[in-house]
Amino acid sequence: MTEPPAEPRYPHHWEADVVLRDGATAHLRPIRAADVEAVRTFHSGQSENSIYMRFFTYKSVLSDKELRRFTEVDHRDRVAFVITVAGAIIGIGRYDRLPDPSVAEVAFNISDAHQGRGLGSILLEHLAAAARENGITRFTAEVLPENRKMLTVFAEAGYEVSRHFDDGVVSLSFDIDPTEKSRAVMESREHRAEARSVAGLLSPASVAVIGGRAPDAGTATGGESLAEQLLEHLVRGGFTGPVHRVNRLDPESFPTIAAVGSVVDLVIIAVPYDQVPATVAECAAAGSKGVLIATGGFADDGELGLVAQRGLVRTARAGGMRLIGPASLGVVNTRPGVSLNASLAPTMPKRGSLGLFSQSAALGAALFAATVQRGLGFSTVVSAGNRADVSGNDIMQYWEDDADTAVCGLYLESIGNPRKFSRLARRLARSKPVIVAKSDALGLQLPPGHAVRTTQAPVGALDAMLRQSGVIRVRTIDELADVAQIAVSQSLPAGPRLAVLSNSLALARVVADSAAQRELSVTRTEAGLRLDGGPEAALPKLREKLLSALRSSDVDSVILTMLPVRSLSVREIAGTLAECAAEVGKPVLAAFSGFVDQQVTVNGLLHAETAAGPLSVPGYTSPGAAIAALAALVRYTAWLRREQGHFED
């Protein structure tokens, strides 16, 4: 008696969570024999026109034989993928190997309700990858000429497609080896989808906060609950959409997210640890578009916590949601039409052009505090926490298209996908400075809660990768703020030539030595500035010296480093510096040694009201810190020139 043939080994590595064109998520996996009823249900929901486009005839139902043929595959000569949301199939793509073993015929069937979301392109990408793995080099397809949507999928895939019309059918054929164009198409699709998914989280039309205590719980637990703080900050920050409170312990709140009665764009979850999985599932069932989990724990708590965290991501993605956290400090979007402070910051941060991303809560809080203390303003702030789903890569995709963000700052404790990070950072750095603070041990040991692999590359290789990507690599939070305050307020330095102005010969020498160590060239020095006689006499002198230096053809940047002058305030000096920098279009920095000004933070962005409007100039208490920050931007502009020399957008 012969043994029945063994069931083909299921290729788990082909499964993937995917982001659709509108930013929602779905799950892609190989089809299974157990999918018979799901395929039957999918087919019964299709319109006559969609069925005709797929089968070239109308089939009101699929026979049992057809269903078995469609669902029983060998994952080699016959491969099929399904895309699911909440367990329901919304798209099917398949290939069947032809007598020529290097060629396979490909076909797609997309749910009427989900057409236009990019499912066909995603299925084609994954089918091509599986086919290449199985030794197939070419796809063919037969498409009715009126099926313009499917023809467009092939035409826009980036392959060299040959076509001919025969007997009322368009026959297509193309090699599936990746080309430069097909890679660009895939990266562009990925970029648009991921950027849009983050935009939905940072610009929600509605927000709900789930959590809190019973109204009569008092303050025995130490003040407001996490949910109450987040809710208060949302309202106080002036969020422009509706804010819903969900707390089953409070009769004046909605008992569940479903009870809100409308789809909520962003749900903030601040419930006890053991309630988080069920709460995420409830949000998915209610059709919520994204969740932010402020509750800590999970991967921080060892293997069982890691398993639970992965379960949260599966639930969210299966329900079409993106997930920030767990252990997230929140997100901020200062755009006036949004005004979202879904964070633990008690007041809405000042609006500006710096985008900020951090991972673990502790370092995220330190980074945010340091940049706020410097007087920097923000476009968006994202704390990813354990970054179980949304990561720095996603945020960079968003920043690339965000007109509100001119400078990007990231504090990284780990990089889950260095190759993708390098590709995205390089593309982003072509248009905006990308400042990355990382420890020298990045990649060698994961921080608690970061459920990603550690890179096997040595630290030196990671640094080289960052340099080649155009990233401005710094080592500390303070260094990130040092560079950011120049980048957000000044023009980029055109080169390394520096003019030094000072009222102290000793300080001028210190700056010159520091500049030489940083490969900057001091081409002009004015070390005998006399700024006495009060503002009326001193400021015009300062302005004259500054403009003379800035207008010099051998000067790219100017630094003013000085000891205190009794008759001049930091604010008065800053106003003159800012005006001159704006007038000429070259960067100006100020290093104040020994200054104590109760009204102004000397080490930070110095703001001034001028005749040209509100302007600012970067201030430092250490000349060395100022020079190091400037040198980092000089290296960036040199990289930018090299990159633009051989890159065509």
Model region roles, listed by residue range:
Residues M1-V198, P204-V207:
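Long, contiguous binding/interaction regions
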Residues D177, K181-D649:
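Catalytic-core regions of core metabolic enzymes
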